[in-house]
């Protein structure tokens, strides 16, 4: 079985309004804004879940056992490239702005949304923008902290 290459195969949108994060519609997604075209290659930061441990060992146990506990995310953010002139994305993703980060993986990023697409939907509130230190031979980069406000749907299907 061949490996799945991620180059050019991750689509990321910010979508302010989704009625059901388990089944976002093509119309809702098309009303959002594509942001993967303004992200650095490592710009989708911290959107990997971690599962806590619940110690369920017994006093009589001779082996420590655990069960799956709460799921959490840590340090989620978007690392983006600043645009010259009017930068709509920079001016939109401001402190307190609520939106949904929608991620589709393993399909060419230029492929339009379609019913039955598998996506991840993260309801977030933006933190303060952090402009990164200037570097030689580099573009102006900035980060937007994203606070996940309700449980995301990591296996949503586009309706």
Model-derived features: where do they sit?
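Short beta-strand and beta-hairpin "edge-sheet" elements
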Residues: 105-155
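Surface-exposed flexible segments
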Residues: 24-33, 90-97, 111-129
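Compositionally biased, intrinsically disordered linkers/stalks adjacent to structured regions
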Residues: 22, 30-32, 147-158
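Hydrophobic transmembrane signal anchors and adjacent membrane-proximal interface regions, especially
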Residues: 12, 71, 95, 119-121, ...
């Amino acid at each position: 079985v061949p490996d799945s290459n991620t180059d050019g195969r991750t689509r990321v949108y910010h979508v302010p309004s989704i009625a059901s994060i388990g089944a976002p519609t093509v119309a809702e997604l098309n009303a959002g804004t594509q942001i993967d075209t303004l992200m650095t290659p490592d710009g989708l930061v911290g959107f990997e879940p971690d599962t806590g441990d619940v110690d369920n060992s017994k006093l009589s146990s001779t082996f420590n056992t655990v069960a799956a506990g709460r799921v959490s995310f840590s340090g989620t953010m978007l690392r983006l490239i600043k645009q010259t002139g009017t930068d709509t994305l920079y001016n939109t993703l401001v402190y307190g702005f609520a939106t949904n980060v929608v991620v589709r993986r393993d399909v060419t990023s230029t492929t339009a949304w379609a019913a039955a697409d598998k996506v991840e939907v993260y309801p977030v509130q933006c933190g303060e923008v952090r402009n990164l230190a200037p570097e030689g031979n580099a573009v102006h980069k900035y980060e937007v902290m994203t606070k996940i406000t309700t449980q995301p749907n990591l296996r949503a299907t586009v309706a």
